[in-house]
Amino acid sequence: YEVYVDSAGSSSGQFSVGWSESSRSITDDNSSGDTEGWITYAINGNYYSNGGNGSYGATYTTGDVIGCKIDTNSSTNNIEFYKNGASQGTKSQAFNTGGTGFISPYILLYGTRNGTARFAYNEWTQTPSGITSSNAINTTNLFGA
């Protein structure tokens, strides 16, 4: 999926996009040490996860498009984030889905920041490398739209 940064807002607030276990509450913040598996790429260029945080990629701002890609076929769930089509690198993230296998998009916004998420392949402005119309999620079948 991708998120268009509609407004980067002021210096206070949060804008992070990524993945989490479906059991994670949407009211949780980006606190390291949580028991649910999650990882995000934040507006300040850092990554945050339940396993820690650190330097990751470029900062982003209003008008940028952030792409989020996950390879669940790998044993470590390889996750890659993109800024305007350019890969920011690959991270590995363990998820404890309790056998459900549900990993969900995770978008954290507060303050004066907002964005627009696009889940349909034909709506993306930037297509991550390795993704084609034949291997992208078919949102028509997924959501019945």
Can you annotate each of these PLM segments?
Residues 2-145:
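PRY/SPRY (B30.2) beta-sandwich protein-interaction domains
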